[in-house]
Amino acid sequence: MAGEKLLAFSVLVMVFLPGCILDFGNSGAVSVKIISVGEKDMVWHFGERVTLNVTVKSSTLLDNVTITIAGLKNELNQMKLYKSTVIELAKGTDIISFSYSVPTCSPCNRLDPGVYYVNATISRNGEVLAEGSGTVKLVK
């Protein structure tokens, strides 16, 4: 009886131990952080063509990553800025640039001059990896 238990234990160890010992270099811990969304004290004018830079730091190379920016929420709760793109993040720091035309008519878009949030989200395979935000002052 004791020999059968020892044999069963030995078989279990042989089956499960290799998965514990073998490491194929993937720790499973991927770190992605949004360092900044835009620059400090951004000011945009109605009708202006602007570039928004999102600075991202990644612990590893990641392909098929979606970065989305959204902001300038108007009186109707509509995001007047919404862009999304699929990129490859390099290990280290990346700067992703978005070009955007600010709406030309503030009453038409229900967008008044003022300070607005611009949010950035990084996701992969439906999982949100990082989020960040910045502010922009919208003037006439």
PLM regions and their residue ranges:
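Secretory targeting signatures
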Residues: 1-32, 54
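N-terminal edge beta-strand
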Residues: 26-47
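Exposed beta-strand and adjacent loop surfaces of beta-rich binding modules
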Residues: 29, 62-69, 115-117, 133
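Contiguous segments within soluble domain cores/interaction surfaces
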Residues: 43-100, 123
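Short glycine/proline/serine/threonine-rich loop/turn segments at secondary-structure transition edges
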Residues: 104-117
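Short beta-strand elements
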Residues: 127-140
